[in-house]
Swiss-Prot record:
The active site is at 79 (nucleophile), 170 (charge relay system), 172 (charge relay system). The keyword Electron transport does not apply. The lineage of its organism: Bacteria, Bacillati, Bacillota, Bacilli, Bacillales. PANTHER family: PYRIDOXAL 5'-PHOSPHATE SYNTHASE SUBUNIT SNO (PTHR31559), PYRIDOXAL 5'-PHOSPHATE SYNTHASE SUBUNIT SNO1-RELATED (PTHR31559:SF0). This is Pyridoxal 5'-phosphate synthase subunit PdxT. L-glutamine binds at residues 47-49, 106, 134-135.
Length: 192
């Protein structure tokens, strides 16, 4: 059985566990570096990206996560997790993990639209996926190897680059598991 980790330092962890299990895989809440060795793919959940970064630094996760990526293992960042994956963040000099060739802007839908739902068409996933956006970032630019999977009002809200998948919204907060299943298929392909 595939083992999918959810970085369990902060954020929407249990909801991801539920969606992984609903797709028939085993979920592992990753709180220690050595747990990275036992999983086939990793979800970086939503939460607060600066808090998550502080905790990643405190527990020494940055380098091991880069090594996990270098080993070819898939990673899926949702909301704050997308910010962690990005090579460039608007208004910041340094990225967090800097793995995915995208530029993201934090809280980019404005305070008035702090949270909202929108129907999205996501390439390879669904034409009618309800995206739950909470203080969401969006992808401002993508590198040439990056495939744009979804846009909302002209803004990129989901993308994939090889083993990396990222989205602005929270797929784990609905009972629609198709985005999680798409990631599990990526993990299956990477293992094959």
């Amino acid at each position: 059985m595939m083992k999918i980790g959810v970085l369990g330092l902060q954020g929407a962890v249990q909801e991801h566990v539920r969606s992984i299990e609903a797709c028939g895989a085993e979920a592992v809440v990753v709180k220690k570096i050595e747990q990275l060795e036992e999983i086939d793919g990793l979800i970086l959940p939503g939460g607060e990206s600066t808090t998550m970064r502080r905790l990643m630094d405190k527990y020494g996760f940055i380098e091991p996560l880069k090594q996990f990526a270098a080993a070819g293992k898939p990673m899926f960042g949702t909301c704050a997790g997308l910010i962690l994956l990005a090579k460039r963040i608007v208004g910041y000099d340094e990225p967090h993990l800097g793995l995915m060739d995208i530029t993201v802007e934090r809280n980019s839908f404005g305070r008035q639209r702090e949270s909202f739902e929108a129907e999205l068409s996501i390439a390879g996933v669904a034409d009618d996926f309800i995206g739950v956006f909470i203080r969401a970032p969006h992808i401002v630019e993508v590198g040439e190897d990056v495939e744009v999977l979804a846009k909302y009002e002209g803004r990129i809200v989901a993308a994939r680059q090889g083993q990396f998948l990222g989205c602005s919204f929270h797929p784990e907060l609905t009972d629609d598991y198709r985005m999680t299943q798409y990631f599990l298929n990526m993990v299956k392909e990477a293992k094959a």
